[in-house]
């Protein structure tokens, strides 16, 4: 694969010419609705099909990582790709995240489009220098002359009984960095449309999946199954409309928020659930528009509470919609401790549906103190 880049450069092609194959992501509304579902698709199948279609459409796209080839991926996301595209485009690497991530960034410098898979995003810490100091900063440091079209993808956050070193959520970590885009799919539609957008994007994208979602099935429409389907980066989706309280969530927590909303509806509380999809850039407009309608906000994430995604959302609402709030913002996050290994303690460290229900009720039944409104 790297030889392709060398031959291209050797033929006198400028890096800018190599980037001409970039296909813009299709523009779409923040809240998309589709006709009746054409079929059910798992998140695993959605990711696999997106990779397959993008590799078929663009020969500069390739996949690299530990066990992505012969083993077809630790979670079988790359099933069938080695047989179809060969070892030049589906590269099994040694167990050295720093090594193969650096190779991927170098390939992106030369106009290729690497998709780098981490077996878990916890292992991306081994490659943090290449992700932050090389991939994220090169466009700025080159005054826009160098694009780095690379995707870093893999499971992020808590799974089931894998301990503190395999369970951390890195959404807030990477969202802190200028030059990176951070995507967090929930459904099969999200996974398929956002991965296509990430691969086509001219900038580095951190694509945070969830191990527990890989096997979950979601209804998808014929439009989602079309090879041209692509979701816009930076646009949230309103999964459920409501009028009493806004709940923001991403990745697996979206499902929890929807379950909580169903419980709340039986008690007369109408919750609006926003699937963030994109953490950086953050769809502040959709969030603030919802809060201006419901006048209450609950933020939900499984990462650590301090300096988290919820804190950023809260600040956005304070800056743009403070006068619309009828109650203090409720923030739900994981426990401020490394993830326990024991199943009972692990459950206590991750937000649960009942936590969301309680927070939404607090938001609905509390009011801003009179002193604060004076």
Swiss-Prot record:
UniProt keyword list: Metal-binding, Mitochondrion, Oxidoreductase, Potassium, Pyruvate, Thiamine pyrophosphate, Transit peptide
InterPro entries: PDHB_mito-type, THDP-binding, Transketo_C/PFOR_II, Transketolase-like_Pyr-bd, Transketolase_C
Catalysed reactions, as listed in the record: N(6)-[(R)-lipoyl]-L-lysyl-[protein] + pyruvate + H(+) = N(6)-[(R)-S(8)-acetyldihydrolipoyl]-L-lysyl-[protein] + CO2
Organelle transit peptide residues: 1-34
GO biological process: pyruvate decarboxylation to acetyl-CoA
Cofactors that this protein relies on: thiamine diphosphate
Subunit structure comment from the entry: Tetramer of 2 alpha and 2 beta subunits.
Protein name: Pyruvate dehydrogenase E1 component subunit beta-1, mitochondrial
Species this protein is from: Oryza sativa subsp. japonica (Rice)
């Amino acid at each position: 694969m790297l030889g392709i880049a060398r031959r291209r450069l050797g033929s006198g092609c400028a890096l800018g010419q190599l980037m001409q194959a970039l296909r813009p992501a299709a523009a779409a509304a923040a809240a998309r609705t589709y006709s009746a579902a054409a079929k059910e698709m798992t998140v695993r199948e959605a990711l696999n099909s997106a990779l397959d279609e993008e590799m078929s459409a663009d020969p500069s796209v390739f996949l690299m990582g530990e066990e992505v080839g012969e083993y077809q991926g630790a979670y079988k996301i790359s099933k069938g790709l080695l047989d179809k595209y060969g070892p030049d485009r589906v590269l099994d690497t040694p167990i050295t995240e720093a090594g193969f991530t650096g190779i991927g960034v170098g390939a992106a410098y030369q106009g290729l489009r690497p998709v780098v898979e981490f077996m878990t995003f916890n292992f991306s810490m081994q490659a943090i220098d290449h992700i932050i100091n090389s991939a994220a900063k090169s466009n700025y440091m080159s005054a826009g002359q160098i694009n780095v079209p690379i995707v870093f993808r893999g499971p992020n956050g808590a799974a089931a009984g894998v301990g503190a070193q395999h369970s951390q959520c890195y959404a807030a970590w990477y969202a802190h960095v200028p030059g990176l885009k951070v995507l967090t799919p929930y459904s099969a539609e999200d996974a398929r449309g956002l991965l296509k957008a990430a691969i086509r994007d001219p900038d580095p994208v951190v694509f945070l999946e969830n191990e527990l979602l890989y096997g979950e099935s979601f209804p998808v429409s014929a439009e989602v199954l079309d090879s041209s389907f692509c979701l816009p980066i930076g646009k949230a989706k309103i999964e459920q409309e409501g009028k009493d309280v806004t709940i923001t969530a991403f990745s697996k927590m979206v499902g929890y928020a929807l379950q909580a909303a169903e419980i709340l509806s039986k008690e007369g509380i109408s919750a609006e659930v926003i699937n963030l999809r994109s953490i950086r850039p953050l769809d502040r407009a959709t969030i603030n528009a919802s809060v201006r309608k419901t006048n209450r906000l609950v933020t939900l994430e499984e990462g650590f509470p301090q300096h988290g995604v919820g804190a950023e959302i809260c600040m956005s609402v304070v800056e743009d919609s403070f006068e619309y709030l009828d109650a203090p913002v409720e923030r739900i996050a994981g426990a401020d401790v490394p993830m326990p290994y024991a199943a009972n303690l692990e459950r206590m460290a991750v937000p649960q549906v009942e936590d969301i229900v309680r927070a939404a009720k607090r938001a609905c039944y509390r009011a801003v103190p009179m002193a604060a409104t004076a």
